Amino acid sequence: MAPTLATAHRRRWWMACTAVLENLLFSAVLLGWGSLLIMLKSEGFYSYLCTEPENVTNGTVGSTAEPGHGEASWMNGWLSCQAQDEMLNLAFTVGSFLLSAITLPLGIVMDKYGPRKLRLLGSACFAVSCLLIAYGASKPNALSVLIFIALALNGFGGMCMTFTSLTLPNMFGDLRSTFIALMIGSYASSAVTFPGIKLIYDAGVSFIIILVVWAGCSGLVFLNCFFNWPLEPFPGPEDMDYSVKVKFSWLGFDHKITGKQFYKQVTTVGRRLSVGSSMRSAKEQVVLQEGHKLCLSTVDLEVKCQPDAAAAPSFMHSVFSPILLLSLITMCVTQLRLIFYMGAMNNILKFLVSGDQKTVGLYTSIFGVLQLLCLLTAPVIDYIMDWRLKECEDASEEPEEKDANQGEKKKKKRDRQIQKITNAMRAFAFTNLLLVGFGVTCLIPNLPLQILSFILHTIVRGFIHSAVGGLYAAVYPSTQFGSLTGLQSLISALFALLQQPLFLAMMGPLQGDPLWVNVGLLLLSLLGFCLPLYLICYRRQLERQLQQRQEDDKLFLKINGSSNQEAFV
């Protein structure tokens, strides 16, 4: 039996803490591909594609044999070669594609069925993916193809876990942004999971046993969701407070009414009650004569609070707006850069150390540990996006007792939307600067310097999604936020599929040398500066519009003697 929203609210701290842990262990774990790749090769996945070399002796994972490019080597008693790398990288491409592309349909499904069912499905898919990998590892020569299905389910299940956890912060009021940062940070830090599992694997624990236990832990996630997550979605901060336990059926309200609708309806009632005492005044009599009923029936509440749809741009208008198109370019380039590096990192390191598998394994573990930096970087970008917003004036807020304070000179506040655009511009400029720095360090064939590349890669990955989300929230209507974010994820995931041909080009014609691929991606990443440059122009446009509105308000005040523009209900 699913708990109610009130019960879920009482358990919100338990749900939030477990959600952070579950994100770390079960969400985007596929981003720790470098460590998983070593384990898959050590277990013989697609080893049958390799031809046994004549001059390389049998070794282990830590073998220091240095075969030439394209030659086979031994890992834990299994052959390893370029054909195997290409096939496994293709499986990673499929899984990472689903990790991003599934966002749009997930948003549609969650709007219809709520987060509970989606999270149950995601945890079940993750458990099945672990069992499929374990089953494939039992007979790798015959069942290696299962890795494609397993990684697809892994990506889908992981994104279900991430997507549903982002609804939990709605229950924490003023701490909402902090918990969103924690959820995003734990999602981005989940790349540390496979490096941690690799440490257990290197300690001698069977790969199959590890995966079976992991699947069992995913079953615990299923049970936690089953007993604690409600059927209804968690209302946002602007929605009804959980402490309200009064039933409003006597008012004829639907049980799924949102807090925003409730607020508008109750506000309408309050206005009519305040008007009731002066109903006999001339102005109200005119209103009554024009057919505007001021009664308190439930029928009268139904249509008096309709949103101003005319003020909001259409969805297609938002899709073809310059900000969205430039953000798509930025996200596509960034996603391709990050995904290619994760997929090709082992081969890049192998090229730098001339095939020393022990050193490759060490640096792969370092990369995995550094993913925990995302828990720190996610709040940083959140702070940048919220910079000075508390000092701003919200356009939706109506000034109270403005006439009484006309003689007092007040400190002029910033416009909230302009400040949000300014913050987004700074966030994107800083993030893209880090991305360019990452591209430069990748060009330098120095092994210790790659640790700096790991750090920059982690920071950019933790920054970019929060920056895009903050920009969309500032520019577009809230009703379009989910659809636009899902569309952006889908398009950037499709573009990131280019990492497979880039990997094939690096392993084939370029003979394992990533130099020219990195040069091309570095030049491509310069396109990311187009968005902050446009945001500067857009901010100036908003400032001109704000100045025009202020001049209009002064003119209205001069003509009417008051700046309080009221609308009669």
UniProtKB/Swiss-Prot annotation:
It catalyses: L-leucine(in) = L-leucine(out); L-isoleucine(in) = L-isoleucine(out); L-methionine(in) = L-methionine(out); L-phenylalanine(in) = L-phenylalanine(out). The keyword RNA-binding does not apply. Gene3D superfamilies: MFS general substrate transporter like domains. It comes from Pongo abelii. The keyword DNA damage does not apply. Residues 395-416 are annotated as: Disordered. It holds the Pfam family MFS_1. Affinity and transport activity are regulated by a phosphorylation switch state at Ser-274 and Ser-297; increasing of affinity and amino acid transport activity via dephosphorylation at Ser-274 and phosphorylation at Ser-297. It is a multi-pass membrane protein. Belongs to the SLC43A transporter (TC 2.A.1.44) family. GO terms for biological process: isoleucine transport; L-leucine transport; methionine transport; phenylalanine transport. This is Large neutral amino acids transporter small subunit 4. The modification Phosphoserine is found at S274, S278, S297. Uniporter that mediates the transport of the stereospecific L-phenylalanine, L-methionine and L-branched-chain amino acids, between the extracellular space and the cytoplasm and may control the transepithelial (re)absorption of neutral amino acid in kidney and small intestine. The transport activity is mediated through facilitated diffusion and is sodium ions-, chloride ions- and pH-independent. Keywords: Amino-acid transport, Cell membrane, Glycoprotein, Membrane, Phosphoprotein, Transmembrane, Transmembrane helix, Transport.
